[in-house]
Amino acid sequence: MSSFQFEQIGVIRSPYKEKFAVPRQPGLVKSANGELHLIAPYNQADAVRGLEAFSHLWILFVFHQTMEGGWRPTVRPPRLGGNARMGVFATRSTFRPNPIGMSLVELKEVVCHKDSVILKLGSLDLVDGTPVVDIKPYLPFAESLPDASASYAQSAPAAEMAVSFTAEVEKQLLTLEKRYPQLTLFIREVLAQDPRPAYRKGEETGKTYAVWLHDFNVRWRVTDAGFEVFALEPR
């Protein structure tokens, strides 16, 4: 059996500082912006010449936060409620024989300086610090297949949860938006996807959660109406 070795070509800088609450697929949180920083010796302007003409990219990356858990022949996809099992190759699970992921993201800008190449990205679904092993331009004529079928994931999951903010948090956000544009929308879109594990959905009102987004510990509680963000704590 052959084995292969690959070099890391870059690293992701993202508002998702932990894997909890990262969308399960790209494109679900449109306001999630980040950057891909190429590293030496790949941080050359020539390496990305012409890339600015493409609107979207495929990013191939390593599931670096789960790779120590090894692979599993069957997994429980969240889209099936976390109960039914499927073969790992019939899912996008992180627990794979080779911990490689792929993400389709929006390319907003290519920024080249003397010693750096930075790709500005949108609709990101990758945790901060994710190692990148390759990037490829998205080709609509070859990769957009409207007649394709996709079993249990034929359509995007609905944004299930209504998200509200306490008056105090709304006041904080008004000030923070000057430094973090679209922060309110970003938090709302992330939480609307209901990042809780499938087995915890339906929990009683009052249960609290927290997630690290940008430079803040975002704390919210379950209410009868959905989720209420009650604290933004600087980290």
Swiss-Prot record:
Outcome of mutating R92A: Inhibits tRNA m(6)t(6)A37 formation
Domain TsaA-like: 6-147
GO BP: any one term: tRNA methylation
Domain of life: Bacteria
GO molecular function: tRNA (L-threonylcarbamoyladenosine(37)-C2) methyltransferase activity; tRNA binding
Catalytic activity: N(6)-L-threonylcarbamoyladenosine(37) in tRNA + S-adenosyl-L-methionine = N(6)-methyl,N(6)-L-threonylcarbamoyladenosine(37) in tRNA + S-adenosyl-L-homocysteine + H(+)
Key words of the record: Methyltransferase, RNA-binding, S-adenosyl-L-methionine, Transferase, tRNA processing
Binding site for S-adenosyl-L-methionine: P23, R24, Q25, H64, Q65, R92, V127, D128, G129, T130
InterPro entries named in the record: TrmO-like_N (IPR023370), TrmO_C (IPR041369), UPF0066_cons_site (IPR023368), YaeB-like (IPR040372), YaeB-like_sf (IPR036413), YaeB_N_sf (IPR036414)
Entry keyword annotation includes tRNA processing: yes
Function: S-adenosyl-L-methionine-dependent methyltransferase responsible for the addition of the methyl group in the formation of N6-methyl-N6-threonylcarbamoyladenosine at position 37 (m(6)t(6)A37) of the tRNA anticodon loop of tRNA(Thr)(GGU) that read codons starting with adenosine. The methyl group of m(6)t(6)A37 appears to slightly improve the efficiency of the tRNA decoding ability.
Assembly behavior: Homodimer.
NCBIfam families: tRNA_TsaA (TIGR00104)
Name of the molecule in the record: tRNA (adenine(37)-N6)-methyltransferase
Primary gene name: trmO
